[in-house]
Amino acid sequence: MNCSKIIPPILRLPAKTFALGVLSLSAFADAAIEEIIVTSDFRDTALLETPASVTVFDSVVIAQRQARHLEQVLNLAPNVNFSSGASRGRFIQIRGIGERSQFIEPLNPSVGTLVDGIDFTGIAGAATTMDIQQIEILRGPQGTLYGANALAGLINLRSNQPTEQPQGNMQISLGDYDTRTVSAALGGPVNDSLGYRVAMQKHSSDGYMVNDFLNRDDTNDIDELSLRTILDWQANQQLDFKLILFHVDADNGYDAFSLDNTRHTLSDTPGHDRHKATAMAVESRWQDAEN
């Protein structure tokens, strides 16, 4: 008689498992999933609706990687590779197509690089991640929108835009090899129709190479300054204008080769990788009043 009241443990396990499953589904249902918007198609499109193979990295991923340059994020994307040939990765390949160096064909970049709509194709050394909101990597031909420079794909960097409320941040970081980074950004409204955002970043490092011939440890150094200003003018309810000013000044060393593949070199005349660029862009958008 007593044996008939004993419930085997195996009968209780499915009930507990089912209860846990219900709780998990409920938790997922309550959690809001943020929608990712892609801007590379000249219009804001949800990632799931974009007719291309796209990888998007937001500011959270960039911060987690402590990335100061595009090259420090590219290796997270599938089917994307890059080579340096200088202090920074500037030759990018998507699905095996693209420049490998400045001396090997094809000399056509094939992979477009845009920073806030400004074309830096072939000179991706200027693509710092200063105040970047997200990085979009489009795999496959994008020639219809961007021409011959995007036959293999496109990399689009979009910075943080002016906000309706005052907003700012500042970061100071220190690291090994005398690495120092100072960055700051400030934005907000000027009046009801005009907004602004300014950002700067100064990044320097001695590098991890030691030149035994010259008895120096800074021949592969990094010294980069980036500045950006965005003015956003809402002319009326349908028409919007943006003025984008961008400046980058890089004076980096280049002393990376050694016969025994160590961090020690014997170069008597180390190289330099200097890059200075100033760019401006004007962007306008019209939105139909019915939308």
Residue ranges of each PLM-predicted region?
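Non-catalytic regulatory/gating segments with a bias toward low-complexity or hydrophobic composition
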Residues: 54, 62, 74, 135-140, ...
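Transmembrane beta-barrel architecture of outer-membrane proteins
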Residues: 65, 89, 110, 152, ...
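Extracytoplasmic beta-strand/coil segments of soluble accessory domains associated
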Residues: 71, 75-118
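Transmembrane beta-barrel wall of Gram-negative outer-membrane proteins
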Residues: 167-169, 174-205, 209-252, 278
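Short acidic/polar hinge/loop motifs at secondary-structure boundaries
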Residues: 102-103, 110-141
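N-terminal periplasmic "start-of-domain" segments of outer-membrane beta-barrel proteins
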Residues: 34-65, 73, 90-93, 110-111
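N-terminal periplasmic accessory domains that precede
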Residues: 70-71, 91-93, 114, 137, ...
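Extracytoplasmic loops and strand-loop junctions of Gram-negative outer membrane beta-barrel proteins
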Residues: 137-138, 166-169, 210-215, 262-268
